[in-house]
UniProtKB/Swiss-Prot annotation:
EC number in record: 2.7.1.130
Domain of life: Bacteria
One GO CC term on file: plasma membrane
Name under which the protein is recorded: Tetraacyldisaccharide 4'-kinase
Gene responsible for this protein: lpxK
UniProt binding sites for ATP: 78-85
Keyword ATP-binding belongs to the record: yes
Biological process per Gene Ontology, one example term: lipid A biosynthetic process
Gene Ontology molecular function: any one: tetraacyldisaccharide 4'-kinase activity
InterPro entries in alphabetical order: LpxK (IPR003758), P-loop_NTPase (IPR027417)
């Protein structure tokens, strides 16, 4: 048996195992099942741990690092993506349009190496992770990747003259000082069973919602007082192999694959566009794809459609019938102005303080 065949077989078994584990976890977290009560004691331990960590930082037993530049954290209080990365891209591009110099820091989930790094266009997902590459590609701003966000911020400030730094996730990273916190909530899944890890999907309690600057709902919401964010596409797909574009509705027959934290949202978005896929195949978030497995999914006349995040990992062995769907963020004019003006005020305040300090230092 050839090595590549054995490798594909092992990857297939790993995929099946991961999918089964994720299905069980989602069942416990998002359904009313008695199984969650068996994990509840561990959630109490988790609560005590995060409470102790919070107190240690609050009482200055552990150090919080502050910088002479505004840091905005875009995160959530549940496990999994709720639309954070598209929002980071949107905010980076909007601030760039307004002539502000923006940098981004990210954890870089799924990468093989742990050293801090600033992304360039030649880096691959195994070096810096799929989401940081996507942010860099779409927004064209400096992106630093490290499990230690303080190191990532210091790297950016060493090489770039920036006005603001955006942290993709990191809400629970207390050592990183910040002046703005935004929480993103997925309106479909919300908080699951409202329990803390591991009995539920929550990283911390809902009390955190009252302490942050903005709470943003991803999806339909009837409450007019809440900032609503919608994800949408422009009805075109891009070829992984040659970069050519095609109307989404012309992509038939189609097989959908998705390896993000909420695959159902992606599948639903495509179906609402009138596409009836032959199959919908879910992969775990940050999944490392196997060329042979993906190639075997389609026949000659079939198209393989994936998320843009998945395309970051698949473009190196792509086929001519593989496509991805770019996703964009939309806010109403009012919500957009509320968000951007609050960020710009902080930038201006920091600039004024720094200028004032420089004058005093010269005296």
């Amino acid at each position: 048996m050839r090595k590549s065949t054995v490798y594909s077989w092992i990857n297939k078994k790993k995929y099946i195992l991961k999918i089964n584990v994720i299905s069980i976890i989602n069942y416990i977290w998002f359904k009313k099942t008695i199984m969650r009560f068996f994990l509840y004691p561990f959630s109490l331990i988790y609560f005590l741990v995060i409470k102790i960590i919070y107190i240690l930082y609050k009482c200055n037993f552990k150090k919080t690092y502050n910088f002479n530049i505004p840091i905005i954290v875009i995160g959530n209080i549940t496990v999994g993506g709720n639309g954070k990365t598209p929002l980071v891209i949107w905010l980076s591009k909007q601030l760039k349009k307004r002539k502000w110099k923006v940098g981004v820091v990210s954890r870089g989930y799924g990468r093989k190496y742990d050293f801090p790094i600033i992304i360039n266009s030649n880096f691959t997902h195994d070096i810096c992770g799929d989401e940081p590459i996507l942010i860099h590609k779409r927004s064209n701003v400096p992106v630093a990747v490290s499990s230690n966000r303080i190191l990532a911020i210091k790297m950016l400030l060493e090489y770039y003259n920036l006005d603001i730094i955006i942290s993709d996730d990191g809400l629970q990273h207390h050592s990183m000082g910040r002046c703005i916190e935004w929480i993103v909530i997925d309106n479909n899944r919300k908080f699951g069973n409202n329990l803390l890890l591991p009995a539920g999907p929550m990283r911390e309690t809902k009390k955190k919602l009252n302490k942050v600057n903005k709470v943003i709902i991803n999806g339909c919401c009837r409450n007019k007082n809440i900032i609503k964010m919608n994800l949408y596409h422009k009805n075109y797909v891009i070829n992984l192999l040659n970069g050519s574009k095609k109307r989404l509705n012309d992509l038939f027959p189609t097989i959908l694959i998705s390896g993000i934290s909420n695959n159902k949202n992606f599948f639903s978005m495509v179906r609402k566009s009138g596409i009836i896929p032959i199959r919908e195949i879910s992969f775990p978030d940050h999944y490392i794809y196997d060329k042979n497995i993906l190639t075997s999914l389609t026949k000659n006349n079939e198209h393989l459609l994936m998320t843009e995040k998945d395309s970051i990992k698949c473009k190196y062995f792509a086929k001519i019938n593989w496509w991805y769907l770019p996703i964009y963020v939309f806010f109403s004019k009012k919500c957009k102005e509320v968000l951007l003006s609050s960020v710009e005020k902080k930038i201006i305040i920091f600039k004024f303080k720094n200028k004032k300090n420089n004058i005093f230092n010269k005296i």
